[in-house]
Protein backbone atom coordinates (compact mmCIF):
# COMPACT_ATOMS: atom_id res chain seq x y z
CA UNK A 1 0.00 0.00 0.00
CA UNK A 2 1.32 3.44 -0.92
CA UNK A 3 0.26 6.98 -1.72
CA UNK A 4 0.74 7.81 -5.39
CA UNK A 5 -0.56 11.39 -5.17
CA UNK A 6 -1.09 13.90 -2.36
CA UNK A 7 -2.79 17.27 -2.85
CA UNK A 8 -2.57 19.81 -0.02
CA UNK A 9 -4.55 23.04 0.15
CA UNK A 10 -4.46 25.79 2.81
CA UNK A 11 -2.66 23.58 5.32
CA UNK A 12 -0.44 25.68 7.60
CA UNK A 13 1.97 27.60 5.34
CA UNK A 14 1.25 25.40 2.30
CA UNK A 15 -1.25 27.29 0.14
CA UNK A 16 -1.29 24.65 -2.57
CA UNK A 17 0.95 21.66 -3.28
CA UNK A 18 0.78 18.43 -5.22
CA UNK A 19 3.20 15.56 -4.66
CA UNK A 20 3.65 12.27 -6.47
CA UNK A 21 5.64 10.16 -4.03
CA UNK A 22 7.20 6.81 -4.86
CA UNK A 23 7.05 3.45 -3.16
CA UNK A 24 9.89 3.09 -0.70
CA UNK A 25 11.66 6.06 0.85
CA UNK A 26 10.67 9.65 0.08
CA UNK A 27 13.02 12.31 1.45
CA UNK A 28 11.61 15.78 2.12
CA UNK A 29 14.13 18.47 3.04
CA UNK A 30 14.17 22.18 3.76
CA UNK A 31 14.97 24.71 6.45
CA UNK A 32 13.05 25.02 9.70
CA UNK A 33 9.65 26.57 9.05
CA UNK A 34 9.76 25.72 5.34
CA UNK A 35 6.73 23.43 5.52
CA UNK A 36 8.37 20.00 5.32
CA UNK A 37 6.82 18.79 8.57
CA UNK A 38 3.46 20.15 7.39
CA UNK A 39 3.53 17.59 4.57
CA UNK A 40 3.84 14.75 7.09
CA UNK A 41 1.16 16.38 9.20
CA UNK A 42 -1.18 16.57 6.20
CA UNK A 43 -0.69 12.86 5.47
CA UNK A 44 -1.40 12.07 9.12
CA UNK A 45 -4.51 14.26 8.99
CA UNK A 46 -5.77 12.20 6.05
CA UNK A 47 -5.33 9.02 8.07
CA UNK A 48 -6.60 10.23 11.44
CA UNK A 49 -8.73 13.32 10.87
CA UNK A 50 -6.51 15.32 13.22
CA UNK A 51 -2.98 16.65 13.65
CA UNK A 52 -0.09 15.02 15.51
CA UNK A 53 1.22 18.49 16.46
CA UNK A 54 -1.86 20.24 17.84
CA UNK A 55 -5.18 19.10 19.30
CA UNK A 56 -6.76 22.27 17.86
CA UNK A 57 -7.43 21.48 14.21
CA UNK A 58 -8.28 25.11 13.45
CA UNK A 59 -4.61 25.98 13.93
CA UNK A 60 -3.52 23.95 10.91
CA UNK A 61 -5.77 25.93 8.53
CA UNK A 62 -3.90 28.60 6.58
CA UNK A 63 -4.58 32.08 7.96
CA UNK A 64 -5.82 33.28 4.55
CA UNK A 65 -8.54 30.63 4.25
CA UNK A 66 -11.48 29.32 6.24
CA UNK A 67 -10.89 25.66 5.40
CA UNK A 68 -8.19 23.16 4.49
CA UNK A 69 -8.49 20.59 1.72
CA UNK A 70 -6.57 17.32 1.41
CA UNK A 71 -6.67 14.60 -1.22
CA UNK A 72 -4.76 11.37 -1.68
CA UNK A 73 -4.70 8.53 -4.18
CA UNK A 74 -3.92 5.30 -2.37
CA UNK A 75 -2.79 2.21 -4.27
CA UNK A 76 -3.13 -1.17 -2.60
CA UNK A 77 -2.60 -4.70 -3.85
CA UNK A 78 -6.31 -5.30 -4.40
CA UNK A 79 -7.74 -1.79 -4.81
CA UNK A 80 -7.18 1.83 -5.70
CA UNK A 81 -8.69 4.31 -3.28
CA UNK A 82 -9.22 8.07 -3.33
CA UNK A 83 -9.50 9.94 -0.05
CA UNK A 84 -10.73 13.52 0.21
CA UNK A 85 -10.98 15.60 3.37
CA UNK A 86 -12.13 19.16 4.03
CA UNK A 87 -11.91 20.77 7.46
CA UNK A 88 -13.60 24.11 8.13
CA UNK A 89 -12.49 26.64 10.70
CA UNK A 90 -15.91 26.22 12.31
CA UNK A 91 -14.95 22.62 13.14
CA UNK A 92 -17.06 20.92 10.49
CA UNK A 93 -15.27 18.09 8.73
CA UNK A 94 -16.18 16.40 5.45
CA UNK A 95 -14.60 13.10 4.42
CA UNK A 96 -15.11 11.12 1.24
CA UNK A 97 -13.61 7.80 0.20
CA UNK A 98 -14.05 6.99 -3.48
CA UNK A 99 -16.65 9.74 -3.68
CA UNK A 100 -18.81 8.34 -0.87
CA UNK A 101 -19.31 10.37 2.31
CA UNK A 102 -17.79 8.82 5.42
CA UNK A 103 -19.48 9.31 8.79
CA UNK A 104 -16.86 7.79 11.10
CA UNK A 105 -13.28 9.06 11.25
CA UNK A 106 -12.26 5.54 12.26
CA UNK A 107 -12.83 4.61 8.60
CA UNK A 108 -9.85 6.83 7.73
CA UNK A 109 -7.60 4.95 10.15
CA UNK A 110 -8.79 1.66 8.72
CA UNK A 111 -8.10 2.82 5.15
CA UNK A 112 -4.79 4.60 5.73
CA UNK A 113 -2.81 3.12 8.67
CA UNK A 114 0.00 5.46 9.68
CA UNK A 115 2.98 5.22 12.02
CA UNK A 116 4.65 8.44 13.20
CA UNK A 117 8.14 8.94 14.60
CA UNK A 118 8.70 12.58 15.58
CA UNK A 119 10.51 14.49 18.33
CA UNK A 120 7.14 14.45 20.13
CA UNK A 121 6.76 10.67 19.86
CA UNK A 122 8.43 10.21 23.22
CA UNK A 123 5.19 11.26 24.89
CA UNK A 124 4.44 7.55 24.50
CA UNK A 125 6.81 6.92 27.40
CA UNK A 126 6.55 10.12 29.43
CA UNK A 127 2.99 11.46 29.29
CA UNK A 128 1.21 8.86 31.38
CA UNK A 129 -0.88 5.86 30.35
CA UNK A 130 -3.28 7.63 27.96
CA UNK A 131 -0.77 7.74 25.09
CA UNK A 132 0.14 4.09 25.65
CA UNK A 133 -3.53 3.06 25.68
CA UNK A 134 -3.96 4.87 22.38
CA UNK A 135 -0.97 2.95 21.03
CA UNK A 136 -2.48 -0.39 22.10
CA UNK A 137 -5.93 0.57 20.85
CA UNK A 138 -4.64 1.54 17.40
CA UNK A 139 -3.31 -1.98 17.01
CA UNK A 140 -6.32 -3.66 18.62
CA UNK A 141 -8.63 -1.70 16.30
CA UNK A 142 -6.80 -3.02 13.24
CA UNK A 143 -6.28 -6.56 14.52
CA UNK A 144 -9.84 -7.38 15.63
CA UNK A 145 -13.02 -6.18 13.86
CA UNK A 146 -15.00 -6.41 17.12
CA UNK A 147 -12.75 -4.07 19.07
CA UNK A 148 -14.06 -0.71 17.89
CA UNK A 149 -17.69 -1.32 18.88
CA UNK A 150 -16.70 -2.83 22.23
CA UNK A 151 -14.48 0.22 22.85
CA UNK A 152 -17.29 2.64 21.91
CA UNK A 153 -19.74 0.79 24.17
CA UNK A 154 -17.28 0.88 27.06
CA UNK A 155 -16.87 4.64 26.74
CA UNK A 156 -20.65 5.16 26.63
CA UNK A 157 -21.23 3.05 29.73
CA UNK A 158 -18.40 4.76 31.63
CA UNK A 159 -19.83 8.16 30.75
CA UNK A 160 -23.26 7.11 32.05
CA UNK A 161 -21.83 5.59 35.24
CA UNK A 162 -19.72 8.66 35.98
CA UNK A 163 -22.72 10.93 35.50
CA UNK A 164 -24.69 8.88 38.01
CA UNK A 165 -21.78 9.06 40.46
CA UNK A 166 -21.64 12.84 40.13
CA UNK A 167 -25.40 12.92 40.78
CA UNK A 168 -24.81 10.98 44.03
CA UNK A 169 -26.98 8.10 42.78
CA UNK A 170 -27.53 5.01 44.92
CA UNK A 171 -25.74 1.78 44.06
CA UNK A 172 -29.06 0.22 43.02
CA UNK A 173 -29.27 2.87 40.28
CA UNK A 174 -25.70 2.18 39.16
CA UNK A 175 -25.81 -1.62 39.33
CA UNK A 176 -27.25 -2.06 35.81
CA UNK A 177 -24.43 0.01 34.31
CA UNK A 178 -21.86 -1.99 36.26
CA UNK A 179 -23.08 -5.18 34.58
CA UNK A 180 -22.80 -3.50 31.19
CA UNK A 181 -19.35 -2.17 32.01
CA UNK A 182 -18.11 -5.60 33.09
CA UNK A 183 -19.39 -7.13 29.84
CA UNK A 184 -17.73 -4.63 27.52
CA UNK A 185 -14.60 -4.27 29.65
CA UNK A 186 -13.92 -7.98 29.32
CA UNK A 187 -14.22 -7.77 25.53
CA UNK A 188 -11.91 -4.75 25.27
CA UNK A 189 -9.40 -6.20 27.73
CA UNK A 190 -9.22 -9.61 26.05
CA UNK A 191 -8.53 -8.05 22.64
CA UNK A 192 -5.96 -5.64 24.06
CA UNK A 193 -4.21 -8.46 25.90
CA UNK A 194 -4.07 -10.68 22.82
CA UNK A 195 -2.74 -7.80 20.77
CA UNK A 196 0.08 -7.00 23.20
CA UNK A 197 1.04 -10.69 23.34
CA UNK A 198 1.33 -10.76 19.54
CA UNK A 199 3.21 -7.46 19.48
CA UNK A 200 5.71 -8.69 22.05
CA UNK A 201 6.83 -11.54 19.80
CA UNK A 202 7.98 -9.07 17.12
CA UNK A 203 9.07 -6.37 19.53
CA UNK A 204 11.67 -8.52 21.29
CA UNK A 205 13.56 -9.09 18.06
CA UNK A 206 13.56 -5.40 17.09
CA UNK A 207 14.60 -4.25 20.56
CA UNK A 208 17.39 -6.82 20.35
CA UNK A 209 18.69 -5.09 17.22
CA UNK A 210 18.49 -1.56 18.64
CA UNK A 211 19.44 -2.28 22.26
CA UNK A 212 21.16 -5.70 22.24
CA UNK A 213 22.54 -5.62 25.78
CA UNK A 214 19.41 -4.43 27.57
CA UNK A 215 16.61 -6.70 28.76
CA UNK A 216 13.34 -4.78 28.43
CA UNK A 217 10.12 -6.35 29.69
CA UNK A 218 6.86 -5.23 28.09
CA UNK A 219 3.56 -6.11 29.75
CA UNK A 220 -0.09 -5.12 29.60
CA UNK A 221 -1.99 -4.02 32.70
CA UNK A 222 -5.77 -4.08 32.39
CA UNK A 223 -6.67 -1.24 34.76
CA UNK A 224 -7.57 -3.40 37.75
CA UNK A 225 -6.01 -6.39 39.51
CA UNK A 226 -6.38 -9.39 37.21
CA UNK A 227 -6.94 -11.64 40.24
CA UNK A 228 -9.94 -9.57 41.35
CA UNK A 229 -13.46 -10.04 40.02
CA UNK A 230 -14.24 -6.76 38.25
CA UNK A 231 -17.95 -6.75 39.15
CA UNK A 232 -17.14 -7.23 42.82
CA UNK A 233 -14.44 -4.56 42.64
CA UNK A 234 -16.90 -2.00 41.22
CA UNK A 235 -19.32 -2.71 44.06
CA UNK A 236 -16.58 -2.56 46.70
CA UNK A 237 -15.27 0.75 45.34
CA UNK A 238 -18.70 2.36 45.00
CA UNK A 239 -18.25 4.66 48.02
CA UNK A 240 -14.82 5.77 46.86
CA UNK A 241 -16.05 6.34 43.29
CA UNK A 242 -19.05 8.27 44.62
CA UNK A 243 -16.78 10.62 46.56
CA UNK A 244 -14.50 11.11 43.55
CA UNK A 245 -17.33 11.47 41.04
CA UNK A 246 -15.73 9.03 38.61
CA UNK A 247 -14.85 5.37 38.13
CA UNK A 248 -11.42 4.64 39.60
CA UNK A 249 -10.75 1.22 38.07
CA UNK A 250 -11.45 -0.27 34.68
CA UNK A 251 -10.26 -0.53 31.08
CA UNK A 252 -9.90 3.27 30.93
CA UNK A 253 -6.95 2.85 33.32
CA UNK A 254 -5.13 0.21 31.26
CA UNK A 255 -1.45 0.69 30.48
CA UNK A 256 1.52 -0.72 28.61
CA UNK A 257 4.41 -1.10 31.04
CA UNK A 258 8.00 -1.12 29.85
CA UNK A 259 10.58 -2.00 32.47
CA UNK A 260 14.30 -2.65 32.76
CA UNK A 261 14.76 -4.81 35.83
CA UNK A 262 12.65 -3.24 38.57
CA UNK A 263 12.68 0.24 37.04
CA UNK A 264 10.37 1.87 34.49
CA UNK A 265 12.17 2.15 31.15
CA UNK A 266 11.99 5.95 31.25
CA UNK A 267 14.01 5.91 34.50
CA UNK A 268 16.51 3.22 33.48
CA UNK A 269 17.37 4.25 29.91
CA UNK A 270 19.17 7.25 28.46
CA UNK A 271 17.31 9.67 26.19
CA UNK A 272 18.96 8.12 23.15
CA UNK A 273 17.96 4.61 24.23
CA UNK A 274 14.38 5.76 24.84
CA UNK A 275 14.26 7.16 21.30
CA UNK A 276 15.28 3.76 19.97
CA UNK A 277 12.68 2.02 22.13
CA UNK A 278 9.90 4.20 20.68
CA UNK A 279 11.19 3.47 17.16
CA UNK A 280 11.11 -0.26 17.96
CA UNK A 281 7.50 -0.01 19.18
CA UNK A 282 6.41 1.76 16.00
CA UNK A 283 8.20 -0.64 13.67
CA UNK A 284 6.85 -3.67 15.55
CA UNK A 285 3.32 -2.31 15.33
CA UNK A 286 3.64 -1.79 11.58
CA UNK A 287 5.13 -5.24 11.06
CA UNK A 288 2.34 -6.87 13.07
CA UNK A 289 -0.27 -5.12 10.91
CA UNK A 290 1.46 -6.52 7.83
CA UNK A 291 1.58 -9.98 9.39
CA UNK A 292 -2.07 -10.00 10.44
CA UNK A 293 -3.77 -8.18 7.54
CA UNK A 294 -1.14 -8.20 4.78
CA UNK A 295 -1.31 -4.40 4.83
CA UNK A 296 1.63 -2.03 5.23
CA UNK A 297 1.53 1.08 7.37
CA UNK A 298 2.87 4.33 5.98
CA UNK A 299 5.76 5.63 8.09
CA UNK A 300 6.22 9.34 8.77
CA UNK A 301 9.61 10.18 10.28
CA UNK A 302 10.19 13.83 11.17
CA UNK A 303 13.57 15.49 11.68
CA UNK A 304 15.48 12.21 11.86
CA UNK A 305 19.07 13.58 11.93
CA UNK A 306 18.45 15.58 15.11
CA UNK A 307 16.93 12.60 16.90
CA UNK A 308 19.56 9.86 16.38
CA UNK A 309 23.30 9.56 15.88
CA UNK A 310 24.65 8.40 12.51
CA UNK A 311 24.96 4.72 13.50
CA UNK A 312 21.43 4.38 14.82
CA UNK A 313 20.03 6.57 12.05
CA UNK A 314 21.44 4.08 9.56
CA UNK A 315 20.04 1.15 11.55
CA UNK A 316 16.56 2.69 11.78
CA UNK A 317 16.41 3.45 8.06
CA UNK A 318 17.57 -0.09 7.30
CA UNK A 319 14.82 -1.62 9.44
CA UNK A 320 12.20 0.71 7.96
CA UNK A 321 13.14 -0.05 4.36
CA UNK A 322 13.15 -3.79 5.12
CA UNK A 323 9.44 -3.56 6.01
CA UNK A 324 8.66 -2.82 2.36
CA UNK A 325 6.44 0.06 3.47
CA UNK A 326 6.27 3.56 2.01
CA UNK A 327 8.32 5.97 4.12
CA UNK A 328 8.40 9.77 4.33
CA UNK A 329 11.46 11.24 6.07
CA UNK A 330 12.16 14.94 6.69
CA UNK A 331 15.51 16.59 7.31
CA UNK A 332 17.17 19.99 7.10
CA UNK A 333 20.29 18.53 5.49
CA UNK A 334 19.43 15.83 2.94
CA UNK A 335 22.99 14.54 2.90
CA UNK A 336 22.62 13.31 6.49
CA UNK A 337 19.91 10.93 5.27
CA UNK A 338 21.56 10.01 1.98
CA UNK A 339 24.75 9.04 3.83
CA UNK A 340 22.71 6.70 6.05
CA UNK A 341 21.18 4.77 3.15
CA UNK A 342 22.62 1.84 1.23
CA UNK A 343 20.98 3.22 -1.94
CA UNK A 344 19.62 6.68 -2.86
CA UNK A 345 16.12 7.75 -1.77
CA UNK A 346 13.40 6.70 -4.20
CA UNK A 347 12.31 10.33 -4.49
CA UNK A 348 13.40 13.68 -3.05
CA UNK A 349 11.37 16.83 -2.47
CA UNK A 350 12.65 20.28 -1.52
CA UNK A 351 10.35 22.59 0.46
CA UNK A 352 10.85 26.35 0.76
CA UNK A 353 8.27 28.78 2.17
CA UNK A 354 5.50 26.26 1.57
CA UNK A 355 6.48 25.56 -2.05
CA UNK A 356 7.31 21.95 -2.89
CA UNK A 357 9.70 20.98 -5.69
CA UNK A 358 10.56 17.45 -6.77
CA UNK A 359 14.31 16.85 -7.19
CA UNK A 360 15.03 14.78 -10.27
Swiss-Prot record:
Annotated transmembrane regions: none
Pfam families to which the protein is assigned, alphabetical: SMC_N (PF02463)
UniProt key word Disulfide bond: no
Superkingdom assignment: Bacteria
InterPro entries reported in the protein's UniProt record: DNA-binding_RecF, DNA-binding_RecF_CS, P-loop_NTPase, RecF/RecN/SMC_N, RecF_2
Gene3D superfamilies in UniProt: P-loop containing nucleotide triphosphate hydrolases (3.40.50.300), RecF/RecN/SMC, N-terminal domain (1.20.1050.90)
GO BP of this protein: DNA replication; DNA synthesis involved in DNA repair; double-strand break repair; SOS response
UniProt keyword terms in alphabetical order: ATP-binding, Cytoplasm, DNA damage, DNA repair, DNA replication, DNA-binding, Nucleotide-binding, SOS response
A single GO molecular function term of this UniProt record: ATP binding
Gene Ontology, cellular component aspect: cytoplasm
Amino-acid positions noted as binding ATP in the UniProt annotation, renumbered to this chain: 30-37
Task performed by this protein: The RecF protein is involved in DNA metabolism; it is required for DNA replication and normal SOS inducibility. RecF binds preferentially to single-stranded, linear DNA. It also seems to bind ATP.
Recorded family membership: Belongs to the RecF family.
Database matches in PANTHER family: DNA REPLICATION AND REPAIR PROTEIN RECF
Protein name: DNA replication and repair protein RecF
Organism this protein belongs to: Shewanella frigidimarina (strain NCIMB 400)
Upper lineage: Bacteria, Pseudomonadati, Pseudomonadota, Gammaproteobacteria, Alteromonadales
Amino acid sequence: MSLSRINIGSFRNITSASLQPCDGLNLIYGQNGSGKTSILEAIYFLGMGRSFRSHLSQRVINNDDDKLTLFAHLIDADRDCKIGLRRHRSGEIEVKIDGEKVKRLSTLAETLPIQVITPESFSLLFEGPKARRQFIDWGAFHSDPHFYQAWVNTRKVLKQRNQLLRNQSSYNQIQFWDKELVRYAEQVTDIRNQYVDSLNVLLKGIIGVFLPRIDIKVSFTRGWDSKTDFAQLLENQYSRDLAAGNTGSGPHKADLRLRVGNLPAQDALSRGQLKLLVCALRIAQGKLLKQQLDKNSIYLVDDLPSELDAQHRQLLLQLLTETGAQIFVTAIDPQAIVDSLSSPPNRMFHVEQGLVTVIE
